[in-house]
Amino acid sequence: IKVAWDEWNVNGWIFDGVNDDNSYGLDNAILTALILQMFIRNCDTVGMANYSTFVNINGAVSVHPGGAVTRAQYPVFELLANHTGKYFYPSEVIGEQLVVPTAAGPKSGRPSENINLAGSGKRKLPSCEIDVIGVTATGNEDGTLYLSIVNKHPDEAREMRIHLDHAPGAYQCVEAYEIHHADLHAANTAEHPDAVAIRAAARPTQQE
């Protein structure tokens, strides 16, 4: 029996501004990516995961009389949908940790590790430590390898070294893409529809 993760979204109900595109920024996109990474890492357990809602309200697409806006979390779905393989490969992150505050679940009253990126680095109770980098690895029968890498730090870029245990030197990076903005709260709006978007990134350099 597998788990069906129904009607998930990264935000609780926003009573003031639920339909405002400015309410859904890059921080929303980062958390969306981390949740999708969690589903991939637990693909042997999670058989179904339904994002709700996808259009309007707090969804990835908002429709207006003059057209539609793909909000900041939309390119995350687009990127992973087109760059995730059929097979999951275990990966491990060794490095820096972030201290982030946690919140009590509004229904159960039990602690839940809701990640507040803007509050990282400020130790408050309750809090938890998380890896500053999130990684998932997938691939296909033809040998293609896909790495999904998320920097959780709200203010700083991070460098990382990728080590492939069983095939050092066997891979070369063909394509690299990123979803990035200098402002953690940058949002896609009708006036600025591509503020948070998929862009070609510098390919990692290969070391001997």
Go through the PLM ranges and name each one.
Residues 1, 68, 98-99, 171, ...:
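Intrinsic structural disorder
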Residues 3-133, 141-144:
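Aromatic/acidic polysaccharide-binding cleft in carbohydrate-active enzymes
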Residues 104-130, 142, 150-208:
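C-terminal beta-sandwich/jelly-roll accessory domains of carbohydrate-active enzymes
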Residues 137:
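Acidic, carboxylate-rich catalytic segments that either coordinate divalent cations
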